[in-house]
Amino acid sequence: MKIIDIQEKIVPINSEIENAYISFAKMDCSVVAIKTDVKVDGENVVGYGFHSNGRYAVSELLTKRFIPRIKAAEEKELLNDEGTNFSPEKIWKVMMQNEKPGGHGERSTAVGTIDMAVWDVISKIERLPLYEHLAKKYGDGKFTNQIFVYAARGYYSPGKDVQML
């Protein structure tokens, strides 16, 4: 079970929305695709990740530090102990080699983008929706189709006001 390629691409957000601080009109973000040698329904499993708007693409961090570390890692450094799937915890350790401890905004954005793609790979290999996989791995296996959300109020499109939200 191997990661055979990791690609990063800059994608423009192309949105005219803005809030009190940020206009998204010229912003972009990084999208990552992790391709594995695992086949599901005859196709290689590919996991995708991206980061939230409000930050610019983090290409240099991804392509110069984190992606090369994963590509250089031994298979056992990336897989769970059973060897049946990838391990997000082990991949995180590989990514964070030689990194100063603590949170750093741009670095956490890059790591989170890869982390999302890793979880996508894992759930596709398991043939389970991610929420089901997480409920089984970290909980009692029970899950609900309802979640709490945070509605930010503040992403306004030109010409719209609070009443139109």
Protein language model features and the residues they cover:
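Metal- or metallocofactor-binding catalytic centers and their adjacent structured scaffolds
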Residues: K39-E126
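Broad gene-expression machinery/nucleic-acid interaction feature
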Residues: C29-V31, T113, Q146-F148
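Short coil/turn motifs at beta-sheet boundaries
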Residues: A25-M27, T109, K142
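Metal-dependent enolase-superfamily TIM-barrel catalytic cores that perform enediolate-based chemistry
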Residues: D140-L165
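N-terminal amphipathic alpha-helix/helix-capping segment at the start of soluble metabolic enzymes
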Residues: M1-Q7, N19-S23, V94, G102, ...
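Residue-level detector of flexible, active-site-proximal loop/helix-junction positions
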Residues: I10-I13, K137, Y156
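Structured beta-strand/loop patches that form or line metal/cofactor-binding pockets in enzymes
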Residues: M1-S59, R65
